Amino acid sequence: MLFLKAVIAILSVLPAADAAAILNFENKQGIIPDSYIVVLKNDISSDDFKSHVAWATGVHNANVAKRDVPLAGMQRTFEMDIFKGYSGAFDRATLDDLLKNEQVDYIEPDRMASAQGWTTQGNAPSWGLGRISHQQRGNTDYVFDSTAGRGITIYGVDSGIDILHAEFGGRATWGANFFNNINTDEFGHGTHTAATFGGTNYGVAKNVNIVAVKVLGDQGQGPWSSIIDGLQWAVNDAREKGILGKAIINFSVGGPSSRAADNALTAAHNAGVFVSAAAGNDGADALNYTPGTARSICVIGNINENDYRFTGNGASNWGTRIDLWAPGTDILSALPQGRYGPMTGTSMAAPHVAGSVAILMASGGVSTAEACGVLKDMSTPSVIEPGQGSTNRLLYNGSGQ
């Protein structure tokens, strides 16, 4: 790729002491040509960040004017506590100038990430609710605390949500769209995951408030830069509403490792928003992919109805980064336009945890920082053949059953 050759050429002439880190350009998976995410150093102030953005915009405009290069330049800015950066389409000269700037920590290529669920055929039963509320498999009743997550808000950072679906009982609202101007779920994945964590009939936490944050399109894909923007919006919305500590992000998205996305996820957690993240469906070590490479957040693997790690098409990732396992195979839930259907993937496992945390927050005042640990303490050692280095702990809501 031409942009990769340009980066190599730039690095060959930059003094090592002056160059910011430039990450993962040798891995071409999902790369969006000429598009970059630039992350600044942690100690930069908000005022200095604004000044830097203005400087970078000016540098780009001057460079493209000289060379008549049709690149968009600055497209998104990110400011989540100590995580500050921006994304855009920049030419070689601008990239050279950015790399030399002492405020820049690292630059990485923007890439496409994907929904982590796979649609399955058939009319599978919704067995997940019964499984997480019983210590033994095979039960169909769902036993849960009567608060059912009342007063807690879950942000579905996904493909959007069909907020008018009867499954949500008027509790779902449209938040923001960072992918296109079509404010609905074109893919189905976001509606399915939202109904799993918060649906009236198929959901874990039946009284939560649900907010749609669209970052993926009709093919279930979106750039990391859009996804980071969605994470930022969710955190800022929770802050503005005064619900930090009572807010959750369900993150059923994943893809090639992105340090910028990892840092944004960690920043969301540090701000007081719990993140339940799908481990990924590559049948590989979760540490090789985002969100598995992010720290602090809770990373969830997928089991089937017999308590085995799912190893079929779209096999669950595994490894030391898995915090918990949850039902994610043939999960029946809502789909757009009033429909219902099954899906399989770690995407379906993560919302079981998101909903369970909502109930813990509502009923017991569990904090963002301690929620994943509390669930691990409550979990049962039930998962069979979880994979090398993996925990065998299965999500359990402590119902006493």
Curated annotation (Swiss-Prot):
GO biological process, one term: proteolysis
Compartment(s) of residence: Secreted
InterPro entries on file: PCSK9_ProteinaseK-like, Peptidase_S8/S53_dom, Peptidase_S8/S53_dom_sf, Peptidase_S8_Ser-AS, Peptidase_S8_subtilisin-like, Peptidase_S8_subtilisin-rel, S8pro/Inhibitor_I9, S8pro/Inhibitor_I9_sf
UniProt EC number: 3.4.21.-
Active site: 158, 189, 347
Enzyme class name: hydrolase
Propeptide regions on this chain: 20-116
Secreted listed as a keyword: yes
Key words of the record: Glycoprotein, Hydrolase, Protease, Secreted, Serine protease, Signal, Virulence, Zymogen
Domain of life: Eukaryota
Residue ranges occupied by any Peptidase S8 domain in the UniProt entry: 126-401
SUPFAM superfamilies in the cross-refs: Protease propeptides/inhibitors (SSF54897), Subtilisin-like (SSF52743)
Glycosylation sites: 250, 397
Family annotation (Gene3D superfamilies): Peptidase S8 propeptide/proteinase inhibitor I9 (3.30.70.80), Peptidase S8/S53 domain (3.40.50.200)
Inhibitor I9 domain: residues covered: 35-112
GO MF, one example: serine-type endopeptidase activity
Family assignment from sequence similarity: Belongs to the peptidase S8 family.
Protein name: Subtilisin-like protease 10
Upper taxonomic lineage: Eukaryota, Fungi, Dikarya, Ascomycota, Pezizomycotina
